[in-house]
Each structure stands twice: as C-alpha cells, then as structure tokens.
Amino acid sequence: MNVKEDMLKKKKEINEKTEIFIFVFLAFILLTTWAMTQPFNSGPDEQMKYYVANYIYKHHGALPRGDDPAVRNKVWGISYAYYPIVSYMVSALFMRISRLFADPGYSMFKIARMADVLFVTGAVYFVVKASGKLFPKEKYSREVRWLFAALAGFMPQAIFMGTYVNTDSLALLAAAMILYAWASYLREDWTWKNCILLAVGMAVCALSYYNAYGWILCSFFFFCFTVLLCREEAFSQRVRFLFSRGAVIAAVTLVLCGWWFIRNAVLYNGDFLGRKSCAECAEKYAQKDYRPSVYPTPAKLGWNWKDIILYQDPGWYHNWILTVCVSFIGTFGQMEIYMPYTVSKLYMLFFAVGIISVFFVKETFDLRKKMYVAQRKAVGNDRWKIKTKVISREWNKEGIFHLMMVFLIMIPVFLFLYYVYYSDNQPQGRYLMPALYPLMYFVTLGWNNILTKTVKNEKVRSLIYRVLTVLLVISPFACWAFLILP
C-alpha cells in the first residue's frame, strides 16, 4: 500500500511540474512572439531606454553617465542612465552574444528585448510557485491556485512589459521573487533558503525601478514583525534570530546592489539615487518648455484632485481615472493601442467584486489568532449550544502578511499620485504594476469566498475556475493577435 501511495505521490508531482512547465512555456512563447513582431519604439520611451543598452553594447560593457549626450534625450534633456540600468546591461549582454553568431543589423533591438522576455517569464514562474503556497491544497482547491497564477501572470499589461526594452519587467521579476519568499515563509518559516531568496529579490528590486521599492520596505517590516511576534521561543532568542538572519539578508542585498548606489554617489556628488542630478540635467539640457522649472504640472496649475481625475486630454479615449484603470489592465504601443473597452470593463468588474468580497472573509486582517469554543448550556428544560469566539494572545502571521499586502498596494499608488501632481501628469497604469500581485491575490481570495458560498457543487465550481483561468490566459494572446499584429 505504501509503495502504491508513493507512486501516486510521484505521479502527482510529475503532473504538477508538467503543468508548471506548460504554463510558463506559454508565457515565454507569447512574450517572444510579441517582442519579435512589434516594431521598434513600440513601448513607452523604448527608444530612450534602448540608447542605454546600445551604449553599453557598443562600449564593451562601459556604463554611461546620466548626462552623456549619447544617451540623453534632446527634448527632455535627461536619460535613463541616471536610474538603475541592470536591465539594460542584460540586454547589452544578449546583443554582444548575438554578434558571435551573426550581425542582426537593424533588428538588434529585438535581441535586446529578450532580456525583458526572460524577466517576465521568470516572474510568471515565481508567481506559479508562490501560488501553491499562498493557496495550499489543505485549504483551497488546485483551481484557485491556477486562477491566481493566470490573473497575476497573464495580465495583458504585465505581459506587454516583457516585450520591449524597459526596467518594469525586472521589477515584476523582483516582486515575484519576494512574493515567493514571503509565501514560502508562511509554510516553512524563515529558513536559510527563504532568507537568501528574499535578499536576492530585494537586491534585484533595488536595481529595477524606484516605484517598486515598496517591496523592499514591506519586506523589512514583514521579516521583523514575523520574527519578533510569531516565533515560538523566548524573546531573547527571537532577537538573536532577527539580527543573525537579518544581518545575512542585509549583507547579501548590499553586496548585490550596493555597487550601483556607490557609483551614483561618486559620479553625482553624493546623489546616490540620481534623481536630483537627473532634474538638474533636465533643467540644463531640456528644450525650454520641458524644463522642470516651467513644465506645467497640476501643482503649478493649481488643480485639485477632482480636476485631475475628471480631466480628459483631446487625444485620450477616456478621462484620467479611467485611462489609468484601462492602462493597468492593458494599453499597448505608445499608450495609443487600447483593448476593447467592454473587455476592460469586465476586468474592472471582476476585480471590484473580488476585492469587495475579501472584506467578508473571516479573519483576513486579524493580527491575533482566534478560535471558536462550542459549549452546551442548560436554559430551563432546554440545552443550548453556544459558540464563543476566543481571541488568543498569539500573533497571526497570515494577518500580518495580509496587512503588508495592503501596504504593497497603497505605496505605489501614493508614489504615482505624488509623481502625477508634482512632476508629470501621465495617466499610465504601468506605474502601478508593483501592486499587481497583492491586488490579484485579494481578487482571488474574494472570488474563492464567493464561489465557495454560492456554488455548492464542487464539480461546477471547479469548472467555473477552469473557464475563468483559460479566458484569462487567452486574453493577452488575443491582444497580440487582434491589436498588435494588424
């Protein structure tokens, strides 16, 4: 009997690995096909970003200064070399390798895009791996896991991030790695493997895009809170564990990413982020109307948030808030290729219903563990069964996890709103992509609550999950076939 059980277990593991491979391979095929079939400069600022990758390629690995004329945009007076450029370094590496076999000529930009293809493919892989731990089989059906993987991995806008030269794709990979580290902790504690994975994820995040830095901040608090509050040992031992493992996490993170910020500090007089130097460069080299001192922003125009939200530029299909929403789901090219509005509205409705339902899931945000004690008491001649809720003194790591996931949604939203109000009013949902995974987690949690309570037939419920998953996976394929190819 044990031999038979072992064989069945191994068969399930093989089937699971096959499913993961097929899922990730589908993403890779779509990303590669999309990247190879769309023309140059088909993503926001791709030309400016490609300048940096091309510079590194042509100068044999040398990194440009932010104000180098070879990478500086003549209109805006800045370059993306002020920001972390690891993504472009990987693109340059692919470009260099391609020259060993042939000269791609004008199509070299397609080779550069392969870095982004692999970043988002890697993100899909870690999302799938995380889904199994976020929605364990002891509590959820396997279809719930795949619904989350489809929502987070095959969001049309997230797929689009992997088809042109940019750093958002690396940010998605970093977020997926960190999410997997968090999810692994929930099932396995802070093992050395999970600590190192967290450190690598944070380092990659630091070298990706600034709007994803919420993942680093929340990782710090999540690690500290779960160690100090949730470990079952003396407080002194928890503190010792915090500093011993925390020191290793910090060291690995700094070793992997610290060089970039040291370089910035040396080049730009202590400006380790490069943002102040970038603004000064824009003031010096930008065309007159595009200099930060005179460029019209909502703050300078005296707009309030109602003015911003309802504003509709003559070239936009929707007002500001709707443009942000639909471009978070999927808007392509230079933000001018829209998905059918009906499809976008269906996505938004699906998200909204799922999020609202989360608030009806018991104990989702409880920071203390709770248990229910059933007692029988005599009332006259009757015996009543009374259910009492008892709040434990123990901290609930799931509740802490959910709280951090809320912050992961809020942080990029606040950063985006600050950028819109004080720097540049661009209603682009791609700036909110760091919130994708926590948002889709709550959407999945909400829909699991809805379907569990309303659809009692397990086979019917399973069918609904599968249909939704297939539709979500097909969606970006349809976007490529009907919107990009024509």
Tell where the protein language model's regions lie, with residue ranges.
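Membrane-interface anchor segments at the N-terminal boundary of transmembrane helices
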Residues: 106-120, 310-409, 436
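Membrane-interface transmembrane helices that cradle and orient dolichyl/undecaprenyl
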Residues: 132-139, 178-197, 205, 227-233
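Transmembrane-helix signature of polytopic, membrane-embedded enzymes
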Residues: 18-21, 103-106, 127-154
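Start-transfer (signal-anchor) and selected internal transmembrane alpha helices
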Residues: 1-33, 227-228, 236-252, 362, ...
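Transmembrane signal-anchor helices characteristic of membrane glycosylation enzymes that use polyprenol
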Residues: 15-47, 54-65, 75, 248-266, ...
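Transmembrane-helix motifs of polytopic, lipid-linked glycan transferases
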Residues: 110-138, 177, 181
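Membrane-lumen/periplasm interface segments of specific transmembrane helices
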Residues: 225, 244-358, 483
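Short acidic/glycine- and proline-prone juxtamembrane loop motifs at membrane-interface regions
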Residues: 157-170
